[in-house]
Amino acid sequence: MASKGPSASSSPENSSAGGPSGSSNGAGESGGQDSTFECNICLDTAKDAVISLCGHLFCWPCLHQWLETRPNRQVCPVCKAGISRDKVIPLYGRGSTGQQDPREKTPPRPQGQRPEPENRGGFQGFGFGDGGFQMSFGIGAFPFGIFATAFNINDGRPPPAVPGTPQYVDEQFLSRLFLFVALVIMFWLLIA
């Protein structure tokens, strides 16, 4: 209820004669600005208002410019959620007569539509790098990522280095060093 919405003066209860709030420029309103929406980009009255799926309101010209200047990373200017031309909904309201057609200045805002929900059946992408299911087993402070590491589940690491390269030599040295450290720790635990 903190967002600005249509004025309460347009409701049937407040439009009765005899009350000062019955007029559109009543004392309770700040210059008639309560009947408008504010764009989250230009912070002005929203022209050709659209709302994103994450719930933020913008002018269509402002949002169109935002999307055009960032074609590779289209995110909501407020919360950084994914946003695109297809993921905004136009807002229509009473008293919007006399507006200029937005197609003359920028491409038209998208039509209102209800997209079908995505069907993600089961464990789609399990272990194939799709960002699907990831598991890890553990007891107390000792995590056992045996299955996750052995089967390369959801692992985004690059392939191992080619034998004979300096990177391969460094990796082998570190591997032997950590093996030696692990053996020393295990030996210390046995004699302690």
Curated annotation (Swiss-Prot):
Any ranges marked Cytoplasmic in the topology annotation, and which? 1-130
Q: Where are the zinc fingers (RING-type)?
A: 39-80
Q: Which residues cross the membrane?
A: 131-151, 172-192
Give the range the annotation lists for the signal sequence: none
Drop me one GO molecular function for this one: ubiquitin binding
* CDD domains tied to this protein: RING-HC_RNF185
Specify where the region named Required for ubiquitin ligase activity and protection against ER stress-induced cell death lies, as residue ranges: 29-80
Q: Which reaction does it catalyse?
A: S-ubiquitinyl-[E2 ubiquitin-conjugating enzyme]-L-cysteine + [acceptor protein]-L-lysine = [E2 ubiquitin-conjugating enzyme]-L-cysteine + N(6)-ubiquitinyl-[acceptor protein]-L-lysine
How would you summarize the oligomeric state and partners of this protein? Interacts with ATG5 and BNIP1.
Entry domain remark: The RING-type zinc finger domain is responsible for E3 ubiquitin ligase activity.
PANTHER family for this protein: E3 UBIQUITIN-PROTEIN LIGASE RNF5-RELATED
This protein is called what?
Answer: E3 ubiquitin-protein ligase RNF185
